[in-house]
Regions:
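Short alpha-helix
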Residues: 177, 182-183, 194-210
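Conserved class I S-adenosyl-L-methionine
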Residues: 1-48, 61-62, 145-181
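Class I SAM-dependent methyltransferase SAM/SAH-binding core
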Residues: 51-55, 59-106
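A short SAM/SAH-binding and catalytic strip from SAM-dependent methyltransferases
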Residues: 116-129
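A short acidic, Gly/Pro-enriched loop at the edge of an enzyme's catalytic core
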Residues: 105-116
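A short glycine-rich, Lys/Arg-flanked "PGG" loop and its adjoining helix->strand segment in the class I
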Residues: 130-145
Length: 210
């Protein structure tokens, strides 16, 4: 059973799922997708056909990129509406990707199941990110790699530096459909999180404990 905060987060991303899917589809179809693939492949173990877990897959951007590159990918997310967008994206490209509704903080996989666990823009949304980190390491095979692409997004909320920043509605990488109400909800959720502290210093302290 998910917590009240997780329900709030899931509701927020449900409201954004369709527009978010449009942004990620746009990225897959332009140079951004190839830039991301090159960056990820530079960090991957030197092995073909890796078994990869995309945690917080959202609309399946990383999962699709890596499946197209020949890897065996599974994507998980807490938000069913996001997963529907991901399945649609994969089906449009005839890709066989397993997408599951799952809590990133309580994985249902056995230990040492994956060569790589990767995530993008997820840890800052988690109520218990330290628990999530422990789970991700648990399902990694010996010598496996954890790739976490994230940022100190709470810094913008703390400083209000983004208050007057407007993104053009047709921007391919912008937050299409991001209303003032959704922005306020995003800010309020962010400030309640343990991870709403200075990063990556917070992450480094946690990772040293694991």
């Amino acid at each position: 059973m998910i917590s009240a905060m997780e329900q709030r987060v899931r509701h927020y991303w449900t409201l954004r799922s369709h527009d978010f899917g449009a942004v990620r589809k746009n990225e897959l179809e332009n140079e951004m997708g190839q830039k991301w693939l090159r960056e990820i492949e530079r960090l991957l173990p030197e092995k073909e056909h890796l078994r990869i877990l995309d945690v917080g897959t959202g609309t399946g951007f990383f999962a699709v990129l890596l499946a197209q590159a020949g890897h065996q990918v599974e994507g998980i997310d807490l938000t069913p509406a996001m997963l529907e967008e991901a399945r649609l994206l994969a089906a449009q490209r005839n890709l066989d990707i397993v997408f599951r509704e799952m809590d990133a903080q309580a994985l249902s996989y056995a230990e040492e199941s994956f060569d790589v666990v990767l995530s993008r823009n997820l840890t800052w949304t988690l109520p218990e990110p330290e628990k999530a980190y422990r789970e991700w390491f648990r399902v990694l095979k010996p010598g496996g790699w954890l790739l976490n692409f994230d940022a100190d997004y709470a810094a913008n909320v703390r400083s209000h530096s983004m208050q007057n920043c407007k993104v053009a509605p047709d921007s391919p990488y912008g937050h299409i459909g991001m209303t003032d109400a959704l922005q306020q909800e995003n800010d309020e959720i962010t400030l309640t999180m343990d991870i709403g502290q200075l990063r990556p210093a917070w992450d480094m302290r946690v990772l040293r404990r694991i």
